[in-house]
Design a protein with these regions (language model features):
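PLP-dependent amino-acid enzyme catalytic core
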Residues: 1-191
Length: 191
């Protein structure tokens, strides 16, 4: 894990959200050397490429995300002069592209041995986190800005057993409150 601003490096076995030196965003640096032939014949989901994802393979938490269909976009493709396809990410388990990152994040949470995960969300993240936490058997706490979340997404979080708390304010205020809780109670925060 490396800071995008100052280059400070951190081990991937510690829970850290921003650079302790300068406060900037962190990035995962993953240098891999695998033959693409190993992916042939595997089930078409995100974990088809497990060698490219730096986690303990025995801890994988999956709902069979990824492998979503392609949709050909003839009109726009013709206009741009290209053969254009888009992915139908609504085919993921919770109906969002967020599931792709969540499977990796939840797998990392299991690898780190955490018991509680949390997020601030306006919908898709809370739905995804709660589904993956339920699959992993982890406690899930979700902070939502009051009145700013689609009922379907709220229902998904509750259906999966998340502890949902409404925060008076906007998303940024919900995130600030969740970050404070995560630091105080040592829960794994999904950003």
């Amino acid at each position: 894990i490396r800071c995008v601003s100052c280059g400070e490096e951190y081990d991937d076995d510690e829970v850290i959200y921003t650079c302790e030196k300068c406060g900037s965003v962190l990035e995962l640096v993953n240098e891999i050397d695998v033959s693409k032939d190993i992916f042939d014949g595997r089930k078409d989901n995100l974990w088809k490429f497990k060698e490219c994802i730096p986690v303990d393979e025995s801890k994988i938490v999956s709902l069979d995300e990824g492998g979503t269909p392609f949709c050909k976009c003839d009109k726009l493709g013709d206009e741009l002069g290209v053969n254009l396809y888009v992915k139908v990410e609504g085919s993921n388990p919770t109906g969002s592209f967020k599931d792709r990152g969540m499977t990796v994040g939840m797998t990392k949470a299991m690898e780190l041995g955490v018991s509680t995960v949390g997020c601030a969300s306006t919908g898709n993240t809370s739905a995804s986190l709660s589904a993956y936490a339920a699959r992993a058997g982890l406690r899930c706490i979700v902070f939502l800005p009051s009145g700013k979340v689609a009922l379907g997404k709220l229902a998904q979080a509750m259906f999966h057993g998340a502890e949902v708390m409404s925060i008076n304010g906007n998303f940024d205020e919900a995130l600030e409150a969740m970050t404070a809780l995560a630091l105080e109670k040592h829960l794994y925060l999904y950003l």
